[in-house]
């Protein structure tokens, strides 16, 4: 039975893809059959033949060393570095939930662990045309629990607590927090983490420092965060 989890963050550019790559790498190095998935990806470069390179997917693939084909990692790839709802409108290929779900289910039939990354923060709109799809709709459709990625630095208390409270109010399960850009011994960052734990009731699962090549979490603890795919 395949298991999966969703990776969301407190916002854009807080290191979701970097941390996701380390998560998938940890699973793969344990011998687990691991896959990566993302519904929509913006801000991608083009190959010489004009096709788009799914940058986040390529990063995770290179970081983790998984053999999963790149073309199975993301059904919607956009060139414009905008929120997916706007990039898709400009480029004429709006996200459709059945397509996202089909790609996910195919991976569930082939891999033991699926790590699905979101776009931006939890309020990121995925499609805002005839269909209105928020990131939370994707999470609910696939019935996934989440890990919350946050920066350890100044301002994170507000971002973490607001994100956690929003998700709790919408019955979205959060298994815990991974803090990125953490500097061991930094008094402010240590206090930020302590306050986030106190104000959200969520555990800190790992701390990632700049340049880390491994995720410092017990592999069994990591695997147990994943829930069975329905």
Report residues per predicted region:
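N-terminal phosphate/diphosphate-binding loop that engages ATP/GTP or pyrophosphate donors
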Residues: 4, 18-94, 98, 105-106
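Hydrophobic anchor at the beta1->P-loop junction of P-loop NTPases
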Residues: 7
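Conserved glycine(s) of the Walker
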Residues: 14-15
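C-terminal lobe/tail of nucleotide-utilizing enzymes
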Residues: 165-230
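Charged helix-capping and loop-helix junction motifs
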Residues: 128-136, 161-164, 189-194
């Amino acid at each position: 039975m395949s298991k999966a989890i969703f990776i969301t963050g407190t916002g854009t550019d807080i290191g979701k893809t970097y941390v996701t790559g380390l998560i998938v790498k940890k699973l793969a190095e344990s011998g687990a059959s691991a896959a990566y998935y993302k519904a929509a990806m913006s801000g991608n470069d083009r190959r010489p033949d004009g096709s788009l390179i799914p940058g986040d997917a390529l990063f995770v693939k290179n970081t983790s060393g998984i053999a999963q084909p790149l073309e199975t990692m993301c059904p919607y790839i956009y060139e414009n570095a905008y929120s997916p709802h706007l990039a898709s409108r400009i480029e004429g290929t709006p996200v459709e939930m059945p397509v996202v779900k089909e790609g996910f289910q195919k991976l569930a039939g082939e891999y033991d662990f699926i790590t699905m990354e979101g776009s931006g923060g939890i309020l990121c709109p995925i499609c805002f045309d005839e269909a209105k799809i928020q990131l939370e709709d994707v999470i609910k459709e696939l019935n996934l629990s989440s890990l919350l990625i946050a920066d350890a630095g100044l301002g994170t208390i507000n971002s973490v607590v607001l994100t956690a409270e929003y998700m709790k109010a919408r019955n979205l399960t959060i298994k815990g927090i991974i803090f990125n850009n953490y500097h061991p011994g930094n008094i402010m960052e240590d206090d930020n983490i302590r306050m986030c734990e106190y104000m959200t009731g969520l555990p800190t699962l790992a701390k990632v420092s700049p340049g880390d090549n491994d995720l410092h979490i017990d592999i069994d603890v990591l695997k147990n965060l994943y829930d069975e795919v329905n």
